[in-house]
Amino acid sequence: MKRSASDSPLLFDLPLAPDFSQEQQLMKRGLKHIAGIDEAGRGPLAGPVVAAAVVLDQNDLPEGLDDSKRLTAARREALYEIILTKAITVSVASLSARSIDASDIRKAALEAMRRAVIGLTLKPCHALVDGRDVPPGLPCPGSALVKGDQRSVSIAAASIVAKVTRDRMMIRAGAAHPPYGLEIHAGYATQKHRAAIESEGPVPGLHRYTFAPIKGRFDC
């Protein structure tokens, strides 16, 4: 499917699986270290938004990288360990539910991305960011790439790291707050989660009070 130039500053057809072509285009311009950036947790009613930044070694790319949403949990876990072993540098950052409520989810996600890039052990020459927005305040130039986790292996790697990190956080949250089943749905608005919120009320610091159906109904 063709995309308009407004969709992304780097225009390609969507491949069957992400590849290294986006990074290679930048490397041809003399840019050496390219970071992929993605986040997990924009939509849930509970928990943080988590962002990851990954700089891959072009000579040792992990096989099987893909958008984290197209992988099973077991496959994500396996690739997560491979990415941490093979990547040049990996960084993760998160913003809490309180931080999300204090601003909004879009700003919080972009800030988490910015912090993830800053946390890398080397300064990347360029950042490829999943979505339509480049986080303000990056320490390097960046490009937004629509469906980037399905187009760039660096972004796909970041999507896996962010997703696995957040899922593990929500498993721990589920153990601390059993009625909500957070370890099952990771904070998303499932029927069980909504029913638990109705019966138990939301948990301050865990639930997002600016998200429906919590917004305006409960005091934080």
UniProtKB/Swiss-Prot annotation:
PROSITE patterns: RNASE_H_2. Keywords: Cytoplasm, Endonuclease, Hydrolase, Manganese, Metal-binding, Nuclease. GO terms for biological process: DNA replication, removal of RNA primer; mismatch repair. A divalent metal cation binds at residues 38-39, 130. GO terms for molecular function: manganese ion binding; RNA binding; RNA-DNA hybrid ribonuclease activity. The keyword Cytoplasm applies. It is an enzyme of class 3 (hydrolase). SUPFAM superfamilies: Ribonuclease H-like (SSF53098). Residues 32-220 form the RNase H type-2 domain. Manganese or magnesium. Binds 1 divalent metal ion per monomer in the absence of substrate. May bind a second metal ion after substrate binding. Endonuclease that specifically degrades the RNA of RNA-DNA hybrids. NCBIfam families: PRK00015.1-3. PANTHER family: RIBONUCLEASE H2 SUBUNIT A (PTHR10954), RIBONUCLEASE HII (PTHR10954:SF18). This is Ribonuclease HII.
